[in-house]
From Swiss-Prot:
Broadest EC class assigned to this enzyme: lyase
Catalysed reactions listed for this entry: orotidine 5'-phosphate + H(+) = UMP + CO2
UniProt cross-references to SUPFAM superfamilies, sorted A to Z: Ribulose-phoshate binding barrel
Protein source organism: Thermoplasma acidophilum (strain ATCC 25905 / DSM 1728 / JCM 9062 / NBRC 15155 / AMRC-C165)
SMART domains: OMPdecase (SM00934)
GO cellular component: a single term: cytosol
Biological process annotations from GO: 'de novo' pyrimidine nucleobase biosynthetic process; 'de novo' UMP biosynthetic process
Lineage: Archaea, Methanobacteriati, Thermoplasmatota, Thermoplasmata, Thermoplasmatales
Family: Belongs to the OMP decarboxylase family. Type 1 subfamily.
Keyword field contains Lyase: yes
Protein name in UniProt: Orotidine 5'-phosphate decarboxylase
Active site residues according to the UniProt entry: 61
InterPro entries assigned to the protein according to its UniProt record, in alphabetical order: Aldolase_TIM, OMPdecase, OMPdecase_arc, OMPdeCOase_dom, RibuloseP-bd_barrel
C-alpha cells in the first residue's frame, strides 16, 4: 500500500490513552496530531514520546507576538515535532518568526477553518495565503468539510494541504482528497471508536480509493 495520507488527531487529556492509541496506529498513518489539551494535561514530553512511533504534528495554532511564537516553535521542534500548525492572521512578522524558529520542522498555516462561524477567517483566505507565502510556510490548513473553499485554495497553491473537518464535523475523507487535500485529519471518529486500528484502516482504504479515482 502507498504511504498513508491520514493524520489522526488525538484531542485527549488522558496521556496513557493517547499513547496507547498512538502505539497501536502509529505505523499505519501519516502522522499523529496533538493539541493543547494533551500537552496541558501532562507535559511537552508527550511530543517526543509519540514521535517514537509516528510523525507528530503540533496543532498549537500559534498566534502571538514574534518572540512568544519563536519560543513555542523552538520547543515543539526540540521535542521532535515533524510539523507545527500556526495561525497567519497575526501578520507576516509573527508567522515568519514561527517559520524561522522551526528549522526543519514543517510549518502549516491556517488559511480557512472547518467550524461554523469561521467566516471572518475563511473570507480572507487570499490575504492569509499571501502572508503565508511570503513567510515561507511548508503548507496550509484548509477545511475538508467546506469543499468549495478547499478547492479554491488548492487552485492557488502547489504546497501541501492538510484538511480537518472529517468525520464528526461532517466531511468525508474521499471528498476532501478529490477537492485537493494532500493529508486528511480525522480525530473523534478514530479515538472515540471501540477499535481505533480498524477505524483508521477503513479511512486509509477510503483515501486510497479516492486517490486512485482522482
Amino acid at each position: 500500500m502507498s504511504e498513508s495520507r491520514l493524520v489522526v488527531a488525538l484531542d485527549l487529556t488522558d496521556k496513557d490513552r493517547a499513547l496507547e492509541i498512538a502505539r497501536s496506529i502509529g505505523r499505519q498513518v501519516f502522522a499523529i496530531k496533538i493539541n493543547w489539551p494533551l500537552v496541558l494535561a501532562g507535559s511537552g514530553s508527550i511530543i517526543g514520546e509519540i514521535a517514537r512511533v509516528s510523525r507528530v504534528v503540533c496543532d498549537f495554532k500559534i498566534a502571538d507576538i514574534p518572540n512568544t511564537n519563536s519560543i513555542i516553535a523552538k520547543f515543539a521542534r526540540d521535542q521532535g515535532a515533524w510539523g507545527i500548525i500556526s495561525h497567519s492572521f497575526t501578520g507576516l512578522e509573527s508567522l515568519r518568526s514561527v517559520v524561522e524558529a522551526s528549522g526543519d520542522t514543517k510549518v502549516f498555516s491556517v488559511v480557512a477553518m472547518s467550524h461554523p462561524g469561521s467566516d471572518l477567517i475563511n473570507d480572507n483566505y487570499r490575504k492569509l495565503m499571501d502572508i503565508s507565502e511570503r513567510a515561507g510556510v511548508y503548507g496550509y490548513i484548509a477545511p475538508g468539510n467546506k469543499l468549495s473553499d478547499l478547492s479554491e485554495i488548492r487552485k492557488r497553491t502547489k504546497k501541501t494541504i492538510m484538511s480537518p473537518g472529517i468525520g464528526s464535523q461532517g466531511g468525508r475523507a474521499s471528498d476532501a482528497i478529490k477537492a485537493g487535500a494532500d493529508l486528511v485529519i480525522v480525530g473523534r471518529s478514530i479515538y472515540e471508536s471501540a477499535d481505533p486500528v480498524t477505524a483508521a484502516e477503513a479511512i486509509n482504504e477510503e483515501i486510497a480509493k479516492a486517490v486512485e479515482q482522482n
